[in-house]
A protein has these predicted regions:
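A short glycine-rich, His/Asp/Glu-containing loop-to-beta-strand
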Residues: 1-34, 40
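Double-stranded beta-helix
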Residues: 3-4, 77, 81-114
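Short, surface-exposed secondary-structure edge patches
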Residues: 23, 43, 58-60
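Short hydrophobic/aromatic-rich beta-strand segments that constitute the beta-sheet cores
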Residues: 33, 53-55, 88
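Glycine- and acidic-residue-biased ligand/ion/polar-headgroup-sensing regions
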Residues: 39-51, 56
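Short acidic-glycine-tyrosine-enriched beta hairpin
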Residues: 56-75
Length: 114
């Protein structure tokens, strides 16, 4: 298994062949970049914590057991409202297919949850 450190936590890549499986560990008060993929089709499943998911301008708080499908071309990001774990199921991941609009970083949760 490959572990990739990120500003917001880390990714544990379980498999990345014709399909991809990852465990995402998201730290409280951090978010990934706002981005989209031209090819990648993904589904996120919340295992632990509370996550603010933003998809194409719509916001939703996700809890353990919730899932969210992200179609190719959909702009998305997630924010850790608590320390969280997310399982990602997707088509093959290629870093060249990630188009970032806003960078990842630390956020003030008071601004988000107000």
């Amino acid at each position: 298994m490959e572990i990739i450190k990120k500003l917001w936590g880390h990714e544990e890549i379980i498999i990345n062949r014709q399909y991809c499986g990852k465990k995402l560990v998201l730290n409280k008060g951090f978010r990934c970049s706002m981005h989209y993929h031209k090819k990648k089709d993904e589904t996120f499943y919340i295992v632990k914590g509370r996550v603010l998911m933003e998809v194409d301008g719509k916001k939703k708080i996700m809890l353990p057991g919730d899932s969210q499908h992200i179609a190719p071309g959909s702009k998305h990001r997630f924010t850790g409202l608590e320390d969280s774990e997310i399982i990602e199921f997707s088509t093959h991941h290629e870093e060249e297919d990630s188009y970032r609009i806003e960078e990842s970083g630390k956020v003030n949760l008071k601004d988000i949850e107000a």
